[in-house]
Swiss-Prot record:
It comes from Buchnera aphidicola subsp. Acyrthosiphon pisum (strain APS) (Acyrthosiphon pisum symbiotic bacterium). One of its GO terms (cellular component) is cell division site. This is Cell division protein FtsZ. Keywords: Cell cycle, Cell division, Cytoplasm, GTP-binding, Nucleotide-binding, Septation. HAMAP family: FtsZ. The lineage of its organism: Bacteria, Pseudomonadati, Pseudomonadota, Gammaproteobacteria, Enterobacterales. InterPro entries: Cell_div_FtsZ, Cell_div_FtsZ_CS, FtsZ/CetZ, FtsZ_C, Tub_FtsZ_C, Tubulin/FtsZ-like_C, Tubulin/FtsZ_2-layer-sand-dom, Tubulin/FtsZ_GTPase_sf. GO terms for molecular function: GTP binding; GTPase activity. It comes from the Bacteria.
Length: 384
């Protein structure tokens, strides 16, 4: 049997939460004890920063906002970040990879996140952003602001994963509590960071180093991520199929992905044929021209359970679209013109249905209760 190899690289990975929603997500990751990464929370709201349990916090734009927040104005968020650009640069400096978590449509997240990403790009840091989009019922203005913020952010990040809050209405049960929804929301961003970071930071039977991750994610544009968890005899097949099929994904051809990153997380009982099963399932939907990187992370606490995380990069719309293209459009027109890629969800083991045939072509609708989704920042504030 293979022996786990020691960590052969010491890549510095930082997770930056920008604004209220991003900071809350980072706080959740700290509590969940994701290993091998440094956490930062950035906000214009001094009171919000004092409340969260994140070791390193950065207040921006104090001369502009006086510590009172950006007031849902992205321009204030942007100028606040630019005011403290040197402070942000010091926080990012020395990183090999940076994750940026933010909610789009408000002030600080929408305005400051692109500035953080621009600084990271100037420093030559591999940068991945995971952001949320508002509900449609929040209004056209907020949606268009979010779309503009996403396009601005896309100019500077290497890969961008977008989580649509509006999908909550379709997949969450009406009886779910706010606390459960908040917990589910935070798990979305945690899953994105954990699935990628652990490939680098955790030893495994087949290690993936930072250079492999960089190859798959560098300058790839829009991305999609999925996670599947299963146990039992067919856990490898089931987990990988769940990871690449989601009721949140609409009309997305994953065969167009230019890069695919796969993390298999299991205990010491992981078998060679299970590794092969996951690999064959992933290759069944990916293009022959795609760069596919598959690695393992060993977690002694996962006795009979196996988790597969798939990140497909270089799919969907082109990078660096012009913001002026959408300024005069309604939110409906914007959504029709730009097809964004959505973060996958992991269904509960008791509710999962397995797709058996031609995964890349199937369009089956699966009724599953998700383990996690995102909640917008304005709902978080109401719950406080």
């Amino acid at each position: 049997m293979f022996e786990p190899s020691e960590l052969s690289n010491n890549a510095i990975i930082k997770v930056i939460g920008v604004g209220g929603g991003g900071s809350n997500a980072v706080e959740h990751m700290v509590r969940e004890r994701i290993e091998g990464v440094e956490f930062f929370a950035i906000n214009t709201d001094a009171q919000a920063l004092r409340k969260i349990e994140v070791g390193q916090t950065i207040q921006i734009g104090n001369n502009i906002t006086k510590g009172l927040g950006a007031g849902a104005n992205p321009e204030i968020g942007r100028t606040s970040a630019e005011e403290d650009k040197e402070l942000l640069k010091s926080a990012l400096d020395g990183s090999d990879m940076v994750f940026i978590a933010a909610g789009m449509g408000g002030g600080t997240g929408t305005g400051a996140a692109p500035v953080v990403a621009e600084i990271a790009k100037e420093l030559g840091i591999l940068t991945v952003a995971v952001v949320t989009k508002p509900f449609n019922f929040e209004g056209k203005k907020r949606m268009i602001v979010a779309e503009q913020g996403i396009i601005e952010l896309s100019k500077y990040v290497d890969s961008l994963i977008i989580i649509p809050n509006d999908k909550l209405l379709k997949v969450l049960s009406r009886g779910i509590s706010l606390l459960d929804a908040f917990s589910a929301a935070n798990n979305v961003l945690k899953g994105a960071v954990q699935g990628i970071a652990e490939l680098i930071t955790r030893p495994g039977l087949m290690n993936v180093d930072f250079a492999d991750v960089r190859t798959v994610m560098l300058e790839m544009g829009y991305a999609m991520m999925g996670t599947g968890i299963s146990s039992g005899e067919n856990r490898a097949e089931e987990a990988s199929e769940i990871a690449i099929s989601s009721p949140l994904l609409e009309d997305i051809d994953l065969s167009g992905a230019r890069g695919v990153l796969v993390n298999i997380t299991a205990g010491f009982d992981l078998k060679l044929d299970e590794f092969e099963t996951v690999g064959n399932t992933i290759r069944s939907f990916s293009s022959d021209h795609a760069t596919v990187v598959i690695g393992t992370s060993l977690d002694p606490d996962m006795n009979d359970t196996l988790r597969v995380t798939v990140v497909a990069t270089g799919i969907g719309m082109e990078k660096n679209l012009d913001v002026n293209q959408i300024k005069n459009k309604s939110s409906r027109e914007v959504l029709m013109d730009y097809r964004y890629q959505y973060l996958n969800i992991s269904p509960k083991k008791t509710d999962k249905k397995i797709i058996k045939k031609e995964i890349k072509n199937t369009k089956e609708k699966i009724n599953k209760e998700p383990e996690y989704l995102d909640i917008p920042s304005f709902l978080r504030k109401r719950a406080d």
